[in-house]
């Protein structure tokens, strides 16, 4: 039974993020990008104000949108040096706190990473577990998958990486 008759029981949010790759080709074995909290070896770096984790940025944006709290750019603007090089875990945890303050918990999330390279699926399970642990929900409630743009556009030319996320938030009792 809904104890808050003016609040919807379910809220859905959609998030999207994109970052450009640095054109420099790095041969260092320690070169990596971070996607959904997991470091993946890759010969290019992401150009970003924070750590450039498109997966966590999209999920953060989805959560904020679901509970009517604006966007990641409003809360953590790339014009503020407070957020320079910060790990995106912080953004996600703060978004979850804002959802809880509004009386909502995260029920489940689905994240799609869009890129030609690096290959995401070998890391998807680890990403799901990482996110679930970060926001304290069952790993079965997080899904990470990947797709390409069939070599079309800037993503197809391997100039960047994108992510979209959808989240279901439920009213807490």
Curated annotation (Swiss-Prot):
UniProt remark on cofactor binding: Binds 1 divalent metal cation per subunit.
EC number: 4.6.1.12
Cofactor(s) needed for function: a divalent metal cation
Keyword terms, alphabetized: Isoprene biosynthesis, Lyase, Metal-binding
Superkingdom in the source lineage: Bacteria
The UniProt record lists the keyword Acetylation: no
Matches recorded under InterPro entries: MECDP_synthase, MECDP_synthase_CS, MECDP_synthase_sf
Gene Ontology MF terms: 2-C-methyl-D-erythritol 2,4-cyclodiphosphate synthase activity; metal ion binding
GO BP: any one term: isopentenyl diphosphate biosynthetic process, methylerythritol 4-phosphate pathway
HAMAP family per UniProt: IspF
Quaternary structure annotation from Swiss-Prot or TrEMBL: Homotrimer.
Family listed: Belongs to the IspF family.
Primary role: Involved in the biosynthesis of isopentenyl diphosphate (IPP) and dimethylallyl diphosphate (DMAPP), two major building blocks of isoprenoid compounds. Catalyzes the conversion of 4-diphosphocytidyl-2-C-methyl-D-erythritol 2-phosphate (CDP-ME2P) to 2-C-methyl-D-erythritol 2,4-cyclodiphosphate (ME-CPP) with a corresponding release of cytidine 5-monophosphate (CMP).
Protein name (database record): 2-C-methyl-D-erythritol 2,4-cyclodiphosphate synthase
Organism per entry: Ehrlichia chaffeensis (strain ATCC CRL-10679 / Arkansas)
């Amino acid at each position: 039974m809904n104890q808050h008759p003016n609040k919807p029981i379910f809220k859905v949010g959609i998030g999207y993020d994109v970052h450009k790759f640095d054109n420099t080709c790095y041969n260092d074995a320690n070169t990596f990008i971070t996607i959904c909290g997991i470091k993946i070896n890759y010969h290019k770096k992401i150009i970003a104000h924070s750590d450039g984790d498109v997966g966590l940025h999209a999920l953060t944006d989805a959560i904020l949108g679901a509970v009517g709290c604006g966007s990641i750019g409003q809360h953590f603007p790339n014009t503020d040096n407070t957020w320079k090089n910060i790990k995106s875990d912080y953004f996600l945890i703060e978004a979850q706190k804002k959802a809880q303050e509004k009386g909502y918990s995260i029920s489940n999330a689905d994240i799609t990473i869009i890129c030609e390279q690096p290959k995401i699926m070998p890391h998807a399970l680890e990403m799901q577990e990482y996110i679930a642990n970060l926001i304290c929900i069952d790993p079965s409630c997080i899904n990470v998958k990947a797709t390409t743009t069939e070599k079309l556009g800037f993503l197809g030319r391997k100039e960047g990486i994108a992510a979209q996320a959808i989240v279901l938030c439920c009213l807490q009792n």
